[in-house]
Amino acid sequence: PMYRASYVYTDDTGKESSTTYSKTFMDAASLSGVSPYHLASRVKQEVVTGPTGMSSSVSGTVAGYEGIYNFYNIGANNSTKAGGAVANGLSWANKDTTYMRPWTNQYKAIVGGAQYLGSNYINVGQNTLYLQKFNVTANNTYNHQYMANIEAPWSESQKTADAYGTDKSDMRLVFSIPVYSGMPS
């Protein structure tokens, strides 16, 4: 639903601007130090629900959170209440002033969310999908995870691989594989 799509948003000065999601992801990558492929794949994992559908967390129309967007579902902790995870994420996106919050338009949500991902995960050692799910780094070991879904590293890696298309064979790959000591043989 975001491929070759544009959107109109109102910036903090009240000026309306039009841009594409592609340009927004490139801006987000530049400002966060995170790959645009990773950012787009993360958003696809988190909020794209089908060929034309997206989660209500990016609609700007959720009751009580009108005009608030969260493309990465940051803070969308699991909840037993219907719509609770979306409400938790939108509440997070609406409070505080770090990472361009409150995320009152798509641009701020995508770029600010990328800055959050870079500052709190990718650029501080949790730079693989595995480490974002299973934190075995020296910082906050076992506690600082990005995703609740046990299958997220696998499914998101498939989306990232698809994003690179056929160009993967010419790329230099660097593998980061945690090695565990004291494991049974």
Listing of model-derived features with the role each one plays in the protein:
Residues K15-K23, G33-Y37, M100-K108:
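Soluble non-cytosolic domains of exported or imported proteins
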Residues T52-V62:
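Short, solvent-exposed loop/turn and secondary-structure capping segments
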Residues P1-S22:
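N-terminal export signals and maturation junctions of secreted/periplasmic proteins
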Residues Q45-E46, S59, Y130-L131:
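Flexible domain-boundary/linker segments
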Residues V62-S185:
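Non-catalytic cell-wall polysaccharide-engagement segments
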Residues P1, Q45-T49, Q115-I122:
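Glycine-rich, acidic and aromatic/proline-enriched surface loops and short helix-turn segments
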Residues M26, S30-P51:
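Short, functionally critical alpha-helical segments immediately adjacent to catalytic or ligand/cofactor-binding
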Residues P1-R4, S35, N70:
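Poly-acidic low-complexity segments
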